[in-house]
Amino acid sequence: MANRSIRDGDNPELLEERRMATFDTDKMAAVIYGSEEFARRRREITDAVSKIPELADIKPYPFLTREEKVTEGTRKISILTKYLNQLIDRDNEEESLHLHREVIGYEGHPFALHDALFIPTLQSQASDEQQEKWLERARRREIIGCYAQTELGHGSNLRNLETTAVYDIASQEFVLHTPTTTALKWWPGALGKSCNYALVVAELIIKRNNYGPHFFMVQLRDEKTHIPLKGVTVGDIGPKMNFNAADNGYLGLNNLRVPRTNLLMRHCKVEADGTYVKPPHAKIGYSGMVKIRSQMAMEQGLFLAHALTIAARYSAVRRQGHLDDKQVEVKVLDYQTQQHRLFPSLARAYAFIFTGFETIHLYSQLLKDVDMGNTSGMADLHALTSGLKSVVAHETGEGIEQARMACGGHGYSMASYISVVYGIAIGGCTYEGENMVMLLQLARYLVKSVELIKAGKAKKLGPVASYLADKSDETDLTSLNGYVKMFENMARRQAWKATEKFLKLMESGESREVAWNKSAVELTRASRLHTRLFIIEAFMRRVSRIEDIPVKEVLTDLLHLHVNYELLDVATYALEFMSFTQLDYVRDQLYLYLEKIRPNAVSLVDSFQISDMQLRSVLGRRDGHVYENLFKWAKSSPLNNADVLPSVEKYLKPMMEKAKL
């Protein structure tokens, strides 16, 4: 079998690992990225980028100031725009995303939200006439846009957004206004200094009637001078935990007037006389958010893959301590504790990516259905992606932090780059909806499903919730399907338990809101179990369709590791369905599959095919030459430009001289 990462001159420690591969890493990459064609295109794009010197980092990112990071991201994006047509198919979103990650990494750039939310929202919410006016300009990058929804005082609670858009019938204009400090738009990427347009989410008000949040196309800056327009207050919100090459911003609007036709009108409309034509589905305007959430499982899986590539490779290079042979130190990756720290997260990375394929497909199908006037799948996908967004982002953060600690002291260095990946990934716990709020949105769906069953209407359940009506308590763990049944038992029991608590509180006289709040912890637990069940099923479905036998065998091992680890992780919910003997069996199976995965561990992370340019890690570099390059990296620190720092001359030397007196 072939690990395609082998090159002459590699560290012998990694060469030894790669020669143990039982599968072809290119074929595994085709499974990870959905097709042989796209896996090949990723490699071609990576190779092409490596031949353009202008796109190389001017110096390691950790040594750049914030302003230098913003400038570097902007420099690269301007150069990249020049080469786009020869590097990628501009209509291929996957190719574009890979190219930008290859060149810019995770630090951010002015077109991140432009491509991820601004353009997709125009595609899904703007009428044909509006798309003709704005969409091609956005695609050509004549204008730079952002998505301005979150406010300083309100994030996930869209019902209480303060920004208003009052319709003036006489002038046929909307008057947009942020009446308070807490109404300021806050956080949108590129809003601070880069973008000149924004899709502003504001409360639509006609004749004092509030029709809820709607999208408005708003010009913020003059297209020639880039100076903010009158009535627009805009700026950068300052440094963040990470993503500091992005100018996340604030926006205030002081009675800014825009034409009536700047309301995005694909699904709703305001006539000249103020007549409001409502959309076919109340949440159809949220399709942009649903898209982001549908992509998040895959995106977070790739963040986790990035960190694990670094940690697994370094763990195969690092030797410390002894086992049987007292003359040779052992590879850190041979310790069971290190395997237990990394391999379950590796299984999750694959599981999240495979789950992402399913949700992206479901979103694509939803768009087709909506165009045909069918919005029946909206609630199901909204609930599913809400749960996935929360569970996957949280578990990814946990896995990345474990990967960092698995690298020992060097993991704490910015040379590892893991802390950067962590800072980006855990942003997913709050952007596009705070995690607890997302779990509770899924919980509403689960409660409604249980109520349907109680009312004898189980046939109305969506396919994802149909197990809630099952009465089987099967506990056979001799097959993967048995593990699925066990998770169904746990998720069903918790969903019913949480729903019954909620209903009993209302029966006792509590208001619906208070009863919901008092049941919230149990409801979020139900949502997590439901989501983890879906992830396991998605992993199983993907593995079942693989045709290459060696690839299928190693992914089956990874799947077995995953289901055993996940079951142990939530074992308190399983105790009423399984014996302690079965629990011991699950634990033994986990340790067995840690051993089975060990020979393929490095090849499994190599299969993600993350280049050194994108990896940006001294510890995880492909050739494994860690120590000499760590020394080289340290010497490049700007503090080493002078043997004696000005601060030493100014403060320390006088202090020490004074102490001698």
From Swiss-Prot:
Species of origin: Caenorhabditis elegans
Residues noted as binding substrate in the record, renumbered to the chain: K283, I284, G285, Y286, R293, Y431, E432
Keyword Transcription: no
Residues that coordinate or bind FAD: Y147, A148, Q149, T150, G155, S156, G189, R318, Q338, Q339, H340, R341, G409, E434
Lineage: Eukaryota, Metazoa, Ecdysozoa, Nematoda, Chromadorea
Protein name: Acyl-coenzyme A oxidase acox-1.2
InterPro entries noted in UniProt: ACOX_C_alpha1, Acyl-CoA_ox_N, Acyl-CoA_Oxase/DH_mid-dom_sf, Acyl-CoA_oxidase, Acyl-CoA_oxidase_C, AcylCo_DH-like_C, AcylCoA_DH/ox_N_sf, AcylCoA_DH/oxidase_NM_dom_sf
GO biological process: ascaroside biosynthetic process; fatty acid beta-oxidation using acyl-CoA oxidase
Pathway the protein acts in: Lipid metabolism; peroxisomal fatty acid beta-oxidation
Localization annotation: Peroxisome
Alphabetically ordered keywords of this record: ATP-binding, FAD, Fatty acid metabolism, Flavoprotein, Lipid metabolism, Nucleotide-binding, Oxidoreductase, Peroxisome
GO cellular component entries: peroxisome
Modulation of this protein's activity: Activated by ATP. ATP binding leads to a conformational change that promotes FAD cofactor binding and enzyme activity. ATP binding likely occurs during acox-1.2 folding and/or dimer formation. The preference for processing substrates with shorter fatty acid chains is likely due to the closed conformation of the active site.
Cited function: Involved in the first step of peroxisomal beta-oxidation by catalyzing the desaturation of fatty acid-derived side chains of ascaroside pheromones, which regulates development and behavior. Specifically, shortens ascarosides with 5-carbon omega side chain (asc-omega-C5). Does not shorten indol-3-carbonyl(IC)-ascaroside with 7-carbon or 9-carbon side chains. Does not catalyze the desaturation of fatty acids or hydroxylated fatty acids.
EC number: 1.3.3.-
Binding-site residues, ATP: H340, S390, H394, Q402, R525, A526, S527, R528, Y573
Active site: E432 (proton acceptor)
Molecular functions per Gene Ontology: acyl-CoA oxidase activity; ATP binding; FAD binding; fatty acid binding; flavin adenine dinucleotide binding
Subunit structure: Homodimer. Forms a heterodimer with acox-1.1.
UniProt motif (Microbody targeting signal) ranges: 659-661
Pfam families: ACOX, ACOX_C_alpha1, Acyl-CoA_ox_N
